């Protein structure tokens, strides 16, 4: 029997390069395999490592990064967000793709401009109010690192060290992954672990959606203890669990175990606990009993006392869950919009006004108060995103035509502050007619007040970023946003200002707006007390493009040049 020797792949490859004219089986396949690049797997040192739960630093956005959408006229960032308000990268890519299409095709702009495309400049996706993250199962192939972290934490629940068990139970609650093996491990340690670990395991089980009678009884026991800090943590975890539970439709909700025993305990805490614990207990009871008069009265009292953040919690429950749209609630919303120091709370107040609607506001006799406050917030709000949200609310409440009439009339006010407020308001309300646009251009040339001039330039730049008609009109106009020097020199009109002689003097402040070519955003870097060195000696004439226009008497200048020439001749 003949023995056929198998061909080694290395011999085939070697013969293929040495004798390419030879024919042998699978020559094409071997050639393709030999020419293909070799991708070696990453070593254990090159593999990216990630730890769950991650450090809080990785959730924070730095204002210098492009995703934070910095305000394009001030050094301070436009938006600071928390970890749950992170910008969706996919939405940003879709928006940029749509904007490129808009710039390339003017006809497409005219068709879509009246719809959602005009809102792409808004950075409000960072401020969108999202419900709390619900617990969910996790597939091993979906996120291998997180799956590995879950396995490690569940093993840590069996550790002989109490601190490791406590940390593992706490971390599993932060991850919000309700896989079967996680729930079983938590239930096991809740029955057999130390008292401290039992407390945290039951709290994590509630957060992950397990609200059976055993968990509720353990939570009731913790709520009855005298430790105020532990009671507050239990109430916070219970509120998070009930918030996720109430977000599910009624036909798909699971029954809360021993609900009849939990309700009296919460009612007692509302009456006898501290203000913060009483509020948390009222919020928990509000999810269980949305029609409770006791909870409604207590939350209405909270609107008039306590911190602004606590008042906002009460407002969310009253407006979104209990659907109470009374006059005190509307006034509390306006108070949050006017004086809250939290950016997200001011933004959410505008959304609450949309939810209530104009009819309810008119029925409570608060239409004039609401109109005046919204009009004020279109110019005195420091953050552009909130001003744009206010403008959207004005349009939703059908108050925009009246407000536009007042703002446009205010442009001719002799008071510079009033004119500046009107200009800033138009930046978010929009320019609705060519007459108003040309009026703004005339004001830009005739305005002597530097702050008003700067606001005019910013408004035109902002409107050009969303309106192709305005962008086309400003095509060959350079808008220089100048910092007013602290001198007594009278500011010159824009048309007589010298253009910067050096390209280094132009500072593009916002790269995204710089993409709106040929619209340029410039800022002169002229410091007080700093003299510029002339580009040409006094005896030489400047090129035509560098000559400034005549802005004053010219005879003294000629005499000065003749005097310099005479001194040089000596």
Swiss-Prot record:
Any coiled-coil regions, as ranges: none
Consequence the record notes for mutating residue 330 to M: In a breast cancer sample; somatic mutation
InterPro entries tied to this protein: ARM-like, ARM-type_fold, HEATR9
Cited SUPFAM superfamilies: ARM repeat
Domain of life assignment: Eukaryota
GO biological process: one example: response to cytokine
Name of protein: Protein HEATR9
Organism taxonomic ancestry: Eukaryota, Metazoa, Chordata, Craniata, Vertebrata
Name of the gene this protein is made from: HEATR9
């Amino acid at each position: 029997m003949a023995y056929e020797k198998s061909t080694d792949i290395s011999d085939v490859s070697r013969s293929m390069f040495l004798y390419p004219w030879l024919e042998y089986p699978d020559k094409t396949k071997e050639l393709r395999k030999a020419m293909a690049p070799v991708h070696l797997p990453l070593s254990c040192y090159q593999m990216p490592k990630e730890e769950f739960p991650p450090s809080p630093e990785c959730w924070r956005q730095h204002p210098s990064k492009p995703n934070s959408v910095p305000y394009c006229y001030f050094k301070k960032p436009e938006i600071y967000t928390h970890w749950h308000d992170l910008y969706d990268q996919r939405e940003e890519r879709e928006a940029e793709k749509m904007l490129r299409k808009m710039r390339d095709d003017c006809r497409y702009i005219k068709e879509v401009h009246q719809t959602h495309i005009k809102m792409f400049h808004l950075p409000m996706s960072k401020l969108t109010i999202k419900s709390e993250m619900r617990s969910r199962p996790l597939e091993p192939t979906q996120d291998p690192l997180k799956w590995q972290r879950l396995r490690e934490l569940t093993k840590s629940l069996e550790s002989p060290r109490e601190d490791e068990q406590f940390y593992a139970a706490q971390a599993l609650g932060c991850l919000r992954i309700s896989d079967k093996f996680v729930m079983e491990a938590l239930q096991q340690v809740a029955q057999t672990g130390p008292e401290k670990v039992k407390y945290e395991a039951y709290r994590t089980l509630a957060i992950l959606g397990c609200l059976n009678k055993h968990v509720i009884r353990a939570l009731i026991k913790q709520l009855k203890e005298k430790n105020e800090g532990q009671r507050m943590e239990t109430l916070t975890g219970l509120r998070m669990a009930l918030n996720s539970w109430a977000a599910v439709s009624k036909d798909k909700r699971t029954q809360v175990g021993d609900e009849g025993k939990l309700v009296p305990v919460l009612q007692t805490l509302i009456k006898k606990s501290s203000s913060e614990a009483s509020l948390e207990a009222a919020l928990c009871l509000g999810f269980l009993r949305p029609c409770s008069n006791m909870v409604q009265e207590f939350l209405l009292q909270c609107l008039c006392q306590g911190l602004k953040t606590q008042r906002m919690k009460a407002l969310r429950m009253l407006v979104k869950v209990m659907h109470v749209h009374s006059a005190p609630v509307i006034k509390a919303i306006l108070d949050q919009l006017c004086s809250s120091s939290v950016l997200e709370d001011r933004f959410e107040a505008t959304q609450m006004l949309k939810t209530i609607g104009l009819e309810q506001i008119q029925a409570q006799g608060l239409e004039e108060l609401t109109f005046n406050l919204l009009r004020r917030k279109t110019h005195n709000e420091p953050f552009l995103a909130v001003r744009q949200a206010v403008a959207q609310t004005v349009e939703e409440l059908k108050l925009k035509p009246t407000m536009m009439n007042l703002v446009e009339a205010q442009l001719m006010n002799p008071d510079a502050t009033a004119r500046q407020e009107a200009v800033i308001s138009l930046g978010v309300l929009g320019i609705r007619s060519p007459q108003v646009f040309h009026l703004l251009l005339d004001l830009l040339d005739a305005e002597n007040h530097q702050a008003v001039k700067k606001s005019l330039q910013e408004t035109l730049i902002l409107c050009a970023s969303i309106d192709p008609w305005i962008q086309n009109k400003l095509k060959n106009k350079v808008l220089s946003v100048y910092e007013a020097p602290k001198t007594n020199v009278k500011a010159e009109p824009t048309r007589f200002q010298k253009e910067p002689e050096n390209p280094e003097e132009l500072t593009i402040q916002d790269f995204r707006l710089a993409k709106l070519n040929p619209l340029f955003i410039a800022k002169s870097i002229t410091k007080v007390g700093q003299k510029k060195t002339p580009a040409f000696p006094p005896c030489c004439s400047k090129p035509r493009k560098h000559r400034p226009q005549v802005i004053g008497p010219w005879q003294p200048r000629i005499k000065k040049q003749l005097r310099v020439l005479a001194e040089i001749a000596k």
